[in-house]
Amino acid sequence: MRRKIMYNPRKYSSQVVDGFERAPSRAMLYPVGFTKEDFNKPQVGIASTWSMVTPCNMHINKLADETLKGVNATGGKAIIFNTITISDGISMGSEGMKYSLVSREVIADSIETVVGCQGFDGVVAIGGCDKNMPGCIIGLVRLNRPSIFVYGGTIQPGKNHTDVVSVFEAVGQFANHTIDAIELENIEKIAIPGPGSCGGMYTANTMASAIEALGMSLPNSSAQDAISDDKNNDCVQAGQAVLNLLNKDIKPRDIMTMKAFENAITVIIALGGSTNAVLHLIAMASAAEVNLKIDDFTRIGQKVPVIADLKPSGKYMMSELVKIGGTLPLMKMLLDAGLLHGDCLTVTGKTLAENLENVKPYADSQEIIRALDNPIKKDSHLRILRGNLATDGAVAKITGKEGLSFKGNAKCFSREEDALEAILNNQIITGDVIVIRYEGPVGGPGMREMLAPTSAVMGKGLGDKVALITDGRFSGGTHGFVVGHITPEAFEGGVLAVVKDGDEILIDAQNNVLELLVEQAIIDKRLYNWTQPKPNYTKGVLAKFAKLAKSASEGAVTD
């Protein structure tokens, strides 16, 4: 009879602290709070993204402390360490935004580095701002040690139901003389009342919801207020749950399967989530060695409706969804309709179906989540477009409010700042297709988000009159007729590089087409005469990212 091999929950820490030869390691750990008994416990690293850089993360040190309590009370030894965060909202529209996507890779690399070096047996990662979520998950799945992600939680609405996007759009209103300087200053002072991630179904809330649907967070972790007893309890429970994962040897790659990624895509479509989910889920799948492709979003999107009336395209904020029950009743609706894989394993140690078994439906009186047979849009708002402008794909977010097609004449800009200046100075008119190029992963480098120009378009009252296309990306707060992630990007010789002012462009979201309506012979001649610009950076982290980054359709990954 074969003897059953028991999993050692101290698989990694034992190599660091066990035996007489590891006395120097133990000596270093006594001053940071270890007792002799602690060396016999599984060590759990708590990766905190705390920072005073942004309100999204300013409270996460307290959440890390709560997580530590949960680990230590359940027989583990928790060690808190930090990784970085940047603020998309603060750097948006500036040269600094080029570092945003880079931060995803730095977060992943730093978590992998610390945990790999220190020999932690398990990990709990806590994130707030947009790139924290995919960065943490990429780091966790590379390590493939028992792990959980905790979302820092959503911010409360500002006064008069405002948020950060309200401020961006107010800039356009000010330029349009719709509001004055005093009104603009008032909006900037009231829009962001305290800690938590940006309040609509923007990138942070989108990715938190995706990670929960993926199975890497505890139930409803994605739908809790940043400052709340629920969020504190979520952290304590995550600390407890990671010990259960250690004892059962359940690791991220056991959870993050192709079917789990399909669940994540389904949920973010139903919620009306950010285009950034396409980029980040592909990157997360790549780290997990799951063969998720950009066209999988089209396949899944054909059968999943948009049912959440959430900002930016809708009316409500995440904190209002929290009040009616969060994301769990929505997931139960999708499961009961056969749109989710209920047999996927999650960090509870149970399947998704088991987690949702006793979830009650939303109250009939609520207006945020619609019934599946009465959707906002009958299929996905995330459209993967192809055509001569995007032979390898582009991503649009079309809810239907903008219409389903747009044909107009190009106005071309090689920097985001130039496009924004043109919008604010009334150089964009009805029927224009604003083309912002050389903003891709390599060309930017860093694939900046175009929230400043798209918000200016909205503030100017042009939201339903113009379109914007780019090889950069969009904030989750962007709405309007916009297409991003155009691949191949301009810097790599994509057709986007040779679009000229006045060229006619067709965006057809119904048939998933993005086409430059110029004869192929003319396009070929332009490409023959095109010369690649000099790189914007030749040293430093941006230059490094430009050398390593793959295309947007491949998640802009660097490994």
Curated annotation (Swiss-Prot):
Binds 1 [2Fe-2S] cluster per subunit. This cluster acts as a Lewis acid cofactor. Functions in the biosynthesis of branched-chain amino acids. Catalyzes the dehydration of (2R,3R)-2,3-dihydroxy-3-methylpentanoate (2,3-dihydroxy-3-methylvalerate) into 2-oxo-3-methylpentanoate (2-oxo-3-methylvalerate) and of (2R)-2,3-dihydroxy-3-methylbutanoate (2,3-dihydroxyisovalerate) into 2-oxo-3-methylbutanoate (2-oxoisovalerate), the penultimate precursor to L-isoleucine and L-valine, respectively. The keyword Metal-binding applies. Mg(2+) binds at residues 88, 130-131, 449. It comes from the Bacteria. Pfam families: ILV_EDD_C, ILVD_EDD_N. Transmembrane segments: none annotated. [2Fe-2S] cluster binds at residues 56, 129, 198. Its cofactor is [2Fe-2S] cluster; Mg(2+). The lineage of its organism: Bacteria, Pseudomonadati, Pseudomonadota, Gammaproteobacteria, Candidatus Pseudothioglobaceae. HAMAP family: IlvD (MF_00012). The active site is at 475 (proton acceptor). Homodimer. This is Dihydroxy-acid dehydratase.
